[in-house]
Amino acid sequence: MEHLLKTDPEVFDAVVKEYERQFYNLEMIASENFTSLAVMEATGSVLTNKYAEGLPGKRYYGGCEYVDVVENLAIERAKKLFGAEHANVQPHSGSQANMAVYFAVLNPGDTIMGMDLAHGGHLTHGAKVNFSGKLYNVIHYGVNPETELIDYDQLYKLAKEHKPKLIVGGASAYPRVFDWAKMREIADEVGALFMVDMAHYAGLIAGGVYPNPVPYAQFVTSTTHKTLRGPRSGFILTTKEYAKAVDKSVFPGIQGGPLMHVIAAKAVAFKEAMSEEFKEYAKQVVENARVLAEELKKYGFKIVTGGTDSHIVLVDLRNKNIIGKDAEKALEKAGITVNKNAVPFDPLPPTKTSGIRIGTAALTTRGMKEDEMRKIAGWINEVLSNMDDEKTIQRVRQEVRELCETFPLYPELKRRIDELRSGKATDL
């Protein structure tokens, strides 16, 4: 970071402050994680200088022999990790991965089915404010009001009635497992294609603790930065039948040159996810979430669906008479970072919400386990029971800081920053 400090002290200062925020706070936003230093090194490598439109061996630029090596590694590792016939690792994000699949098999005005955003779905699954809701005729399925689990009977009835061309599975705030086999069965019966957006669950699937949709879906999309613990990006898995259509849809359909430095980081992340250590990590992520959910229930919090099968704990705050927006702010003051989130059949708008979404992926990366989850549940209860008590909030803030120091984040980076700040660095 010495070059950044010398060239642009203002950006250096902002980066360091963000590092310190991550270090001294409990990052519990379910879509966030901490990459390895190897992933960050790949992202910051000389590959950022290279244009490489096209696919390995079929580029529109010269000098691509080494970026071809990198992209082929990423492709083969993604296929092996998830058991897929074909992978495209060029999408810049999960949203663009979804767009590429839509553009590959749909025409404007076609009918698609996706999970209602208010029930845990994602913007790109047909929300009105998103391109997917503007270009396509969207029918939403949701959860049962009693169990808060996906209502497959409703999904089936809607599919029979509306005959969608594509059914989309996956979510951004659904803590339980999906029945991929049942969804594929419904899709086949109505003549629909089946796509799964596994962005939130990809790392858990790679680790073998969450059902793999690849055997059931013609298309599987994902980000790489959530539970998969890679760079901020996306990828697509598909069958040989749809490989050419997907590749053409990504380039030249919706993107130009791929980000080769990010593809290198994806290759690294896929390799890391193949390890036994990663399998243990994924298992611990889910165990931490389950313990956190059970502890919060002991304090009287209502957990949506009654628990979790993943890294997500969705808390309905209505029985506590707390608005999600206020809970998010109070917890942030205490050093606990979560996000306000709608709960099923939420009467409040998304700017306020009746719930919060909590995730365990990032803290598990830091090495925290069940005992820490119990402690954190207690802090969440203390803060949300005393939201106007500054003394309580500051006491919890100090205790959070002490816990974070026990599980240091990127200690090598901290030492380097300290050297640069003190002027002791010798290679400026």
UniProtKB/Swiss-Prot annotation:
Coarse class of the protein's main subcellular location: cytoplasm
CDD domains membership: SHMT (cd00378)
SUPFAM superfamilies named among the record's database cross-references: PLP-dependent transferases
InterPro entries xrefs: PyrdxlP-dep_Trfase, PyrdxlP-dep_Trfase_major, PyrdxlP-dep_Trfase_small, Ser_HO-MeTrfase, Ser_HO-MeTrfase-like, Ser_HO-MeTrfase_PLP_BS, SHMT-like_dom
Location relative to the cell: Cytoplasm
Keywords tagged on the record: Amino-acid biosynthesis, Cytoplasm, One-carbon metabolism, Pyridoxal phosphate, Transferase
Reactions performed catalytically: (6R)-5,10-methylene-5,6,7,8-tetrahydrofolate + glycine + H2O = (6S)-5,6,7,8-tetrahydrofolate + L-serine
Residues the UniProt record annotates as site (Plays an important role in substrate specificity): 225
Protein's GO biological process: glycine biosynthetic process from serine; tetrahydrofolate interconversion; tetrahydrofolate metabolic process
Pathway as given in its UniProt record: One-carbon metabolism; tetrahydrofolate interconversion; Amino-acid biosynthesis; glycine biosynthesis; glycine from L-serine: step 1/1
PROSITE patterns the UniProt entry points to: SHMT
GO molecular function, one term: glycine hydroxymethyltransferase activity
Pfam families (alphabetical): SHMT
Enzyme Commission code(s) on record: 2.1.2.1
Gene3D superfamilies xrefs: Aspartate Aminotransferase, domain 1 (3.90.1150.10), Type I PLP-dependent aspartate aminotransferase-like (Major domain) (3.40.640.10)
Function: Catalyzes the reversible interconversion of serine and glycine with tetrahydrofolate (THF) serving as the one-carbon carrier. This reaction serves as the major source of one-carbon groups required for the biosynthesis of purines, thymidylate, methionine, and other important biomolecules. Also exhibits THF-independent aldolase activity toward beta-hydroxyamino acids, producing glycine and aldehydes, via a retro-aldol mechanism.
Similarity field: Belongs to the SHMT family.
Protein name: Serine hydroxymethyltransferase
Organism: Aquifex aeolicus (strain VF5)
